[in-house]
């Protein structure tokens, strides 16, 4: 079992990256949101989930930049009919908080994703509603990301992963300008990344 991997991103594709760890390239599947903070040459640390694909006799690695996304995948794959690939598709469309809210509010439209039929959506809502409400009430630091603030800070030259790690702590009800102002103060200790 692999708990996490740290390395340099060698290649970025539509649903995965190749992460170079001590000159070994690992194919790691990521959600679209996690892929947004990966670029060639960046150094990252990913939490890892391992999935054995018995039909193809292979093992696939799924990576996460935060524990919330990893926890969501673990919950989703416990639902009968939800594969790792399907769970990653869900996490590519919805943030963990959006997913939790969709389940708690029984929002079938939010969960409408390619490959998810009505029966599977109902099963996800039914099987996870109790578990999600417990997680939500126990996790006070769980906020969605302000994408406008992320984009603005990256355009100012700050590294994507540092921007993401900084902004994910802020409450969503803050104005974008306030988030940027607060993040700039926190990021001022970091060097500006002059590579585009």
Swiss-Prot record:
Residues 144-147 are annotated as: Flexible linker. GO terms for molecular function: ATP binding; four-way junction DNA binding; four-way junction helicase activity. Residues 1-65 are annotated as: Domain I. GO terms for cellular component: cytoplasm; Holliday junction helicase complex; Holliday junction resolvase complex. Keywords: Cytoplasm, DNA damage, DNA recombination, DNA repair, DNA-binding. Residues 66-143 are annotated as: Domain II. InterPro entries: DNA_helicase_Holl-junc_RuvA_I, NA-bd_OB-fold, RuvA, RuvA_2-like, RuvA_C, RuvA_C_sf. It is found in: Cytoplasm. GO terms for biological process: DNA recombination; DNA repair. Residues 147-196 are annotated as: Domain III. It comes from the Bacteria. Belongs to the RuvA family. Has three domains with a flexible linker between the domains II and III and assumes an 'L' shape. Domain III is highly mobile and contacts RuvB. Homotetramer. Forms an RuvA(8)-RuvB(12)-Holliday junction (HJ) complex. HJ DNA is sandwiched between 2 RuvA tetramers; dsDNA enters through RuvA and exits via RuvB. An RuvB hexamer assembles on each DNA strand where it exits the tetramer. Each RuvB hexamer is contacted by two RuvA subunits (via domain III) on 2 adjacent RuvB subunits; this complex drives branch migration. In the full resolvosome a probable DNA-RuvA(4)-RuvB(12)-RuvC(2) complex forms which resolves the HJ. The RuvA-RuvB-RuvC complex processes Holliday junction (HJ) DNA during genetic recombination and DNA repair, while the RuvA-RuvB complex plays an important role in the rescue of blocked DNA replication forks via replication fork reversal (RFR). RuvA specifically binds to HJ cruciform DNA, conferring on it an open structure. The RuvB hexamer acts as an ATP-dependent pump, pulling dsDNA into and through the RuvAB complex. HJ branch migration allows RuvC to scan DNA until it finds its consensus sequence, where it cleaves and resolves the cruciform DNA. This is Holliday junction branch migration complex subunit RuvA.
């Amino acid at each position: 079992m692999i708990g996490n991997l740290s390395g340099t991103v060698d290649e970025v594709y539509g649903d995965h990256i190749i992460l170079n760890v001590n000159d070994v390239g690992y194919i790691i599947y990521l959600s679209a949101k996690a892929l947004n903070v990966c670029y060639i040459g960046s150094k990252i640390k990913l939490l890892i989930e391992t999935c054995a694909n018995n039909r193809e006799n292979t093992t696939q690695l799924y990576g996460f930049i935060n524990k919330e996304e990893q926890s969501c995948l673990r919950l989703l794959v416990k639902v009968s009919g939800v594969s790792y690939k399907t769970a990653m598709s869900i996490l590519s469309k919805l943030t963990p908080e959006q997913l939790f809210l969709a389940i708690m509010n029984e929002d079938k439209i939010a969960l409408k994703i390619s490959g998810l039929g009505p029966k599977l959506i109902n099963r996800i809502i039914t099987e996870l509603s109790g578990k999600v409400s417990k997680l939500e009430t126990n996790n006070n630091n769980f906020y969605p990301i302000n994408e406008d603030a992320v984009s603005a800070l990256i355009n100012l030259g700050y590294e994507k992963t540092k921007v993401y790690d900084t902004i994910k702590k802020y409450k969503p009800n803050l104005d974008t300008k306030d988030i940027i102002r607060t993040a700039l103060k926190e990021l001022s200790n970091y060097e500006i990344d002059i590579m585009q």
